[in-house]
Amino acid sequence: MLEKILATKREEISQLQLPEKQYFPKKSLKASLQKTSLPLGLIAEIKQASPSKGVLCETISPTAIARVYEEGGASAISVLTDRTYFQGDTAYVAEVKKTVSLPVLRKDFILSPLQVEETACIGADAMLLIAGAMEAKQLHELYELAYSKGLECLVEVHSEEELESLLAVFTPEVIGINNRNLKTFQTSVSQTEQIAKMVPKEALLVSESGIHTPDDIARVKKAGANAVLIGEQLMRKDDKRQAIIDLFSESAINQ
């Protein structure tokens, strides 16, 4: 599935034109995750659909969702901008930036310098880079370009091998472990438990995907995660603020 998505993305890049630049005060993703009021930092995601789960919500209001996430204690907002597979939109980034005071992470399949430029133009504070989508050297080049544009990066790995290749080139400031197996699309927080021991102490660690219960959060916290990225579990709930409260139940997490 990843290869199919990347092939589509390369076709989109060939036709990409930079939008007019949006100007917003920059907010640090890393700093915001470090000063959370919750047991772990929370990147709450706005996602209408996904290839593995289909449509999560028939209609969405990114601004309304972002506002509720902020009220619930989120440290940052992740915004899906891929149209073809996730029904996202780059316009959502500016809409959310205008609504909340939190940093906004652009979640997409970033493969080229032009997309980094686009990310800076649309007003994001940070962007996702996926280790499984490119060689570590190419990822490092995009990472350096992003930081030169005032953007932070969440660098995502799916395996010990990907992390090992990445660390041979450089150590990202924020590393994400995706709990989804890209071959089967099944999720398990055991992925974070297995890979976290390889993450350098100086990097901030985010556990992504497949987090559905307070026990899942307790497990990744024990494994060394500093933050979690949660999308589907929140998007499926009518009361998203209560969903955050339920997931981050102190008594359950600190058992």
From Swiss-Prot:
SUPFAM superfamilies: Ribulose-phoshate binding barrel. Transmembrane segments: none annotated. Pathway: Amino-acid biosynthesis; L-tryptophan biosynthesis; L-tryptophan from chorismate: step 4/5. One of its GO terms (molecular function) is indole-3-glycerol-phosphate synthase activity. It catalyses: 1-(2-carboxyphenylamino)-1-deoxy-D-ribulose 5-phosphate + H(+) = (1S,2R)-1-C-(indol-3-yl)glycerol 3-phosphate + CO2 + H2O. Its EC number is 4.1.1.48. It holds the Pfam family IGPS. PROSITE patterns: IGPS. GO terms for biological process: L-tryptophan biosynthetic process. Belongs to the TrpC family. This is Indole-3-glycerol phosphate synthase.
